[in-house]
Amino acid sequence: MVIGSFPVGKIFIHGVKRISKPFGDLLIWMGKHHPFIRRYIIIPPAQLYNTFEVRSKLRMLRLKQPRRIPPLSTPVATRLGADMLSEAFVFGIGAGLIYYELSKTYTKTKKQNQEIEDQKRVLDECVDCISADVERNQREINWIKAALKNVEK
């Protein structure tokens, strides 16, 4: 990735990584003080993750699957959900940066390819003009040769 070669890019990436912890702490605080955010934004991803984790561990151990997985307690689910959302935030920024770099590279490559195509077209036109000049000169040479043969006779 191009951004790794520039110090400013490395500093920015490091800053984004450093933001994830305060962002997670903010989510935990919001989860404690705002029941709507806790109930509908932070806890559902944690409970879903817990369900997948327990079921996959039981599958790996080849144990019987329970019908219902007991939910996590509210503080544990809040902590896990906030950590997951803060990591998703950092991942989203990283994915956005990768997308930005790729789109910029794609645009640059597309522009270069267009310039190459334009140069090819110009060169083809020049070759066509030169070919027409060669044909015209060849006809004139043949006409001059024919005229010289007529003069010699």
Curated annotation (Swiss-Prot):
Belongs to the OPA3 family. This is Putative OPA3-like protein CG43998. GO terms for biological process: regulation of lipid metabolic process. GO terms for cellular component: mitochondrion. Keywords: Coiled coil. InterPro entries: OPA3-like. The lineage of its organism: Eukaryota, Metazoa, Ecdysozoa, Arthropoda, Hexapoda. Residues 101-153 form a coiled coil.
